A protein has these predicted regions:
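Domain-level signature for proteins that mediate thiol-based redox and metal-cofactor handling
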Residues: 1-196
Length: 196
């Protein structure tokens, strides 16, 4: 028996993003991808490529069972939510490819003119990853985003915030008062957490 695909829209703390949650797995557990343009999605995610045909779509983030879409400021969600929800639902229902292959990790794609920071493996990496996975990732995913641990060096934990967390007005507070305090409590060696 085929279970019909359902997709519902869920607001996030970031007013420019909306989370579209499916009753089907879109990617493997722990996998996520983010695309800032149709060109970035080309050859990786046909779903994201098609979503960029909507003129108001600025970013597409896909993970286990949801797609988070970031829109331009000039169109209210009231006018586009149903159209996007139906599009995602129909794409999944028709068996359209969500992802053909994983792109190179986002941490290895520097912004133009910026160098990529390469972190040495530290004795704290596993403990930090475990704390982020257990306490932080579920809450961040619930808000339509993701957190990626990039490295630890001299008391500083560096992470990447993705999906609805990227550019969210409350992400700085979450980072400093939530994540940083949690890591400091469990690992006194941690002095600060920064996002890139």
């Amino acid at each position: 028996m085929n279970i019909p695909v359902t997709v519902y829209a869920e607001m996030t703390p970031n007013p420019t993003t909306m989370k579209f949650v499916a009753n089907k797995h879109l990617l493997g557990t722990g996998d996520s991808v983010s695309f800032g343009s149709k060109a970035e999605a080309k050859g990786y995610s046909p779903l994201a490529e098609e979503l960029f045909n909507f003129p108001f779509v600025q970013n597409v983030f896909i993970t286990s069972n949801f797609v988070t879409i970031t829109k331009t400021d000039n169109v209210p969600w009231d006018f586009i939510t149903m159209e996007l929800r139906e599009f995602v639902k129909n794409w999944i229902s028709s068996g359209g490819d969500v992802l053909i292959q994983m792109p190179a990790p986002t941490a290895s794609k520097p912004e133009e003119g910026k160098e990529v920071k390469v972190f040495e493996v530290s004795e704290y990496d596993d403990a930090i990853r475990n704390l982020l996975d257990e306490y932080v990732r579920p809450a961040v995913e619930n808000d339509g985003g993701n957190i990626e641990f990039l490295g630890y060096e001299e008391g500083t934990v560096t992470v990447s915030m993705q999906g609805s967390c990227a550019g969210c007005p409350s992400s700085t507070a979450t980072l400093k008062f939530g994540i940083e305090n949690l890591l400091k409590q469990h690992l006194p060696e941690v002095k600060e957490v920064v996002a890139v």
